[in-house]
Amino acid sequence: MQNSNSFPDWHGTTILAVRKNGSTVIAGDGQVSMGPTVVKGNARKVRRLAGGKVVAGFAGATADAFTLIERLEAKLEQYPDQLARACVDLAKDWRTDRYLRRLEAMLLVADADSIFTVTGVGDVLEPGESTGGGSVAAIGSGGNYALAAAKALIDQDLTAEEIARKAMGIAAEICVYTNGNLTVESL
Protein backbone atom coordinates (compact mmCIF):
# COMPACT_ATOMS: atom_id res chain seq x y z
CA MET A 1 0.00 0.00 0.00
CA GLN A 2 1.12 3.52 -0.61
CA ASN A 3 0.42 6.60 1.43
CA SER A 4 -0.58 9.97 0.01
CA ASN A 5 3.07 11.01 -0.42
CA SER A 6 3.71 8.11 -2.85
CA PHE A 7 6.29 6.59 -0.53
CA PRO A 8 5.81 2.90 0.25
CA ASP A 9 4.46 2.09 3.68
CA TRP A 10 6.68 -0.19 5.76
CA HIS A 11 5.23 -3.67 5.54
CA GLY A 12 4.96 -6.28 8.31
CA THR A 13 8.35 -7.95 8.43
CA THR A 14 11.96 -7.08 9.16
CA ILE A 15 14.93 -7.50 6.83
CA LEU A 16 18.40 -6.29 7.89
CA ALA A 17 21.70 -6.12 6.02
CA VAL A 18 25.02 -5.69 7.84
CA ARG A 19 28.43 -5.29 6.21
CA LYS A 20 31.53 -5.31 8.39
CA ASN A 21 35.16 -6.36 7.97
CA GLY A 22 34.59 -7.80 4.50
CA SER A 23 31.56 -9.87 5.51
CA THR A 24 28.01 -9.11 4.39
CA VAL A 25 24.93 -10.65 6.01
CA ILE A 26 21.22 -10.32 5.31
CA ALA A 27 18.81 -11.56 7.96
CA GLY A 28 15.02 -11.78 7.79
CA ASP A 29 12.37 -12.85 10.25
CA GLY A 30 9.91 -15.64 9.48
CA GLN A 31 6.55 -14.16 10.44
CA VAL A 32 3.72 -13.81 7.93
CA SER A 33 0.72 -11.81 9.12
CA MET A 34 -2.70 -11.12 7.66
CA GLY A 35 -3.89 -8.06 9.51
CA PRO A 36 -3.60 -8.79 13.23
CA THR A 37 -3.27 -12.57 12.74
CA VAL A 38 -0.01 -14.52 12.47
CA VAL A 39 -0.52 -17.16 9.77
CA LYS A 40 3.02 -18.53 9.49
CA GLY A 41 6.10 -18.28 11.64
CA ASN A 42 8.85 -19.80 9.50
CA ALA A 43 8.69 -18.12 6.08
CA ARG A 44 11.95 -17.59 4.14
CA LYS A 45 12.14 -13.95 3.09
CA VAL A 46 15.85 -14.03 2.25
CA ARG A 47 17.14 -15.72 -0.92
CA ARG A 48 20.44 -16.32 -2.69
CA LEU A 49 20.63 -15.22 -6.33
CA ALA A 50 23.21 -15.14 -9.14
CA GLY A 51 24.79 -18.46 -8.25
CA GLY A 52 25.06 -17.47 -4.59
CA LYS A 53 26.93 -14.20 -5.21
CA VAL A 54 23.93 -12.01 -4.33
CA VAL A 55 21.50 -12.17 -1.41
CA ALA A 56 18.07 -10.50 -1.47
CA GLY A 57 15.47 -10.03 1.22
CA PHE A 58 11.97 -8.69 0.76
CA ALA A 59 9.19 -6.99 2.67
CA GLY A 60 5.66 -6.55 1.42
CA ALA A 61 3.20 -8.62 -0.55
CA THR A 62 4.77 -12.03 -1.15
CA ALA A 63 3.60 -12.57 -4.73
CA ASP A 64 4.77 -9.06 -5.62
CA ALA A 65 8.13 -9.67 -3.98
CA PHE A 66 8.64 -12.93 -5.89
CA THR A 67 7.85 -11.12 -9.14
CA LEU A 68 10.50 -8.53 -8.30
CA ILE A 69 13.04 -11.19 -7.28
CA GLU A 70 12.50 -12.91 -10.66
CA ARG A 71 13.00 -9.58 -12.44
CA LEU A 72 16.15 -8.91 -10.42
CA GLU A 73 17.51 -12.35 -11.34
CA ALA A 74 16.95 -11.54 -15.02
CA LYS A 75 18.76 -8.21 -14.58
CA LEU A 76 21.67 -9.97 -12.85
CA GLU A 77 21.92 -12.36 -15.81
CA GLN A 78 21.87 -9.37 -18.16
CA TYR A 79 24.49 -7.51 -16.09
CA PRO A 80 26.66 -10.17 -14.40
CA ASP A 81 28.72 -8.93 -11.44
CA GLN A 82 27.12 -5.47 -11.73
CA LEU A 83 24.68 -5.37 -8.84
CA ALA A 84 24.28 -1.58 -8.84
CA ARG A 85 23.41 -1.54 -12.53
CA ALA A 86 20.96 -4.43 -12.14
CA CYS A 87 19.23 -2.68 -9.22
CA VAL A 88 18.99 0.65 -11.04
CA ASP A 89 17.59 -1.05 -14.13
CA LEU A 90 15.05 -2.94 -12.01
CA ALA A 91 14.01 0.28 -10.23
CA LYS A 92 13.63 2.03 -13.58
CA ASP A 93 11.39 -0.75 -14.92
CA TRP A 94 9.48 -0.91 -11.63
CA ARG A 95 8.81 2.83 -11.75
CA THR A 96 7.83 3.08 -15.42
CA ASP A 97 6.04 -0.21 -16.20
CA ARG A 98 2.28 0.06 -15.71
CA TYR A 99 2.02 -3.48 -14.27
CA LEU A 100 5.15 -3.37 -12.10
CA ARG A 101 4.41 -0.02 -10.47
CA ARG A 102 1.38 -1.59 -8.77
CA LEU A 103 3.59 -4.08 -6.93
CA GLU A 104 3.73 -3.55 -3.18
CA ALA A 105 7.09 -4.73 -1.92
CA MET A 106 10.61 -3.54 -1.16
CA LEU A 107 13.92 -5.31 -1.68
CA LEU A 108 17.15 -5.27 0.30
CA VAL A 109 19.92 -6.62 -1.94
CA ALA A 110 23.62 -7.22 -1.28
CA ASP A 111 26.73 -8.71 -2.80
CA ALA A 112 30.20 -8.94 -1.28
CA ASP A 113 30.83 -5.22 -1.87
CA SER A 114 27.51 -3.36 -1.70
CA ILE A 115 24.09 -3.15 -0.08
CA PHE A 116 21.09 -1.58 -1.83
CA THR A 117 17.50 -0.83 -0.85
CA VAL A 118 15.27 -0.89 -3.94
CA THR A 119 11.77 0.63 -3.85
CA GLY A 120 8.86 0.97 -6.23
CA VAL A 121 9.14 4.74 -6.37
CA GLY A 122 12.46 4.46 -8.19
CA ASP A 123 14.84 4.62 -5.24
CA VAL A 124 18.07 2.64 -5.18
CA LEU A 125 19.66 3.56 -1.87
CA GLU A 126 23.14 2.53 -0.77
CA PRO A 127 23.84 3.15 2.93
CA GLY A 128 26.85 5.18 3.91
CA GLU A 129 29.48 3.87 6.28
CA SER A 130 28.47 3.94 9.94
CA THR A 131 30.57 5.85 12.46
CA GLY A 132 31.95 2.57 13.79
CA GLY A 133 32.82 1.30 10.31
CA GLY A 134 30.75 -1.03 8.20
CA SER A 135 27.29 -0.29 6.85
CA VAL A 136 23.74 -1.30 7.67
CA ALA A 137 20.33 -1.05 5.99
CA ALA A 138 16.90 -2.34 6.90
CA ILE A 139 13.35 -2.52 5.54
CA GLY A 140 9.98 -3.56 6.87
CA SER A 141 7.87 -2.70 9.88
CA GLY A 142 10.66 -3.57 12.30
CA GLY A 143 13.35 -2.13 10.04
CA ASN A 144 13.96 1.05 12.01
CA TYR A 145 14.36 -0.91 15.25
CA ALA A 146 16.80 -3.36 13.66
CA LEU A 147 18.66 -0.50 11.96
CA ALA A 148 19.09 1.44 15.20
CA ALA A 149 20.24 -1.66 17.08
CA ALA A 150 22.72 -2.61 14.34
CA LYS A 151 24.14 0.92 14.23
CA ALA A 152 24.61 0.80 18.01
CA LEU A 153 26.43 -2.54 17.73
CA ILE A 154 28.54 -1.91 14.60
CA ASP A 155 31.57 -0.59 16.52
CA GLN A 156 31.54 -3.47 19.02
CA ASP A 157 33.82 -6.50 18.75
CA LEU A 158 31.15 -8.53 16.92
CA THR A 159 30.96 -10.11 13.48
CA ALA A 160 28.42 -8.95 10.90
CA GLU A 161 26.35 -12.06 11.60
CA GLU A 162 26.42 -11.53 15.36
CA ILE A 163 25.31 -7.92 14.89
CA ALA A 164 22.51 -8.99 12.55
CA ARG A 165 21.24 -11.67 14.94
CA LYS A 166 21.32 -9.36 17.99
CA ALA A 167 19.67 -6.47 16.13
CA MET A 168 16.95 -8.73 14.72
CA GLY A 169 16.32 -10.08 18.22
CA ILE A 170 15.78 -6.55 19.48
CA ALA A 171 13.44 -5.76 16.58
CA ALA A 172 11.45 -8.94 17.31
CA GLU A 173 10.98 -7.83 20.92
CA ILE A 174 9.57 -4.46 19.82
CA CYS A 175 7.70 -5.03 16.53
CA VAL A 176 4.58 -7.22 16.70
CA TYR A 177 4.95 -8.06 12.98
CA THR A 178 8.46 -9.52 13.47
CA ASN A 179 9.47 -12.79 15.11
CA GLY A 180 12.76 -14.32 16.19
CA ASN A 181 12.71 -17.18 13.66
CA LEU A 182 15.52 -15.92 11.42
CA THR A 183 16.87 -16.77 8.01
CA VAL A 184 20.46 -15.54 7.79
CA GLU A 185 22.56 -15.60 4.62
CA SER A 186 26.22 -14.54 4.57
CA LEU A 187 28.57 -13.52 1.78
Curated annotation (Swiss-Prot):
What is the enzyme's main class?
hydrolase
Question: So what EC number does this one have?
Answer: 3.4.25.2
Q: List keywords of the entry alphabetically.
A: Allosteric enzyme, Cytoplasm, Hydrolase, Metal-binding, Protease, Sodium, Threonine protease
Q: Extract the GO molecular function terms from the UniProt entry.
A: metal ion binding; threonine-type endopeptidase activity
> Cellular location of this protein?
Cytoplasm
**InterPro entries xref list:** ATP-dep_Prtase_HsIV_su, Ntn_hydrolases_N, Proteasome_sua/b, Proteasome_suB-type
Gene Ontology biological process terms in this record: proteolysis involved in protein catabolic process
Q: Which amino acid positions bind Na(+), per UniProt?
A: 172, 175, 178
What Gene3D superfamilies does its record include?
Answer: Glutamine Phosphoribosylpyrophosphate, subunit 1, domain 1 (3.60.20.10)
Active site, UniProt feature: 13
**Superkingdom per UniProt:** Bacteria
- Reactions catalysed, as given in the entry: ATP-dependent cleavage of peptide bonds with broad specificity
Keyword Cytoplasm recorded:
yes
Q: GO CC terms for this protein? A: HslUV protease complex; proteasome core complex
Matching Pfam families:
Proteasome
Tell me, in a sentence or two, what this protein's role is.
Protease subunit of a proteasome-like degradation complex believed to be a general protein degrading machinery.
- Known partners and oligomeric status: A double ring-shaped homohexamer of HslV is capped on each side by a ring-shaped HslU homohexamer. The assembly of the HslU/HslV complex is dependent on binding of ATP.
The UniProt similarity line reads:
Belongs to the peptidase T1B family. HslV subfamily.
HAMAP family, per database record: HslV
Please identify the protein, giving its name as recorded.
ATP-dependent protease subunit HslV
- Its source organism is Caulobacter sp. (strain K31)
Gene from which this protein is expressed: hslV
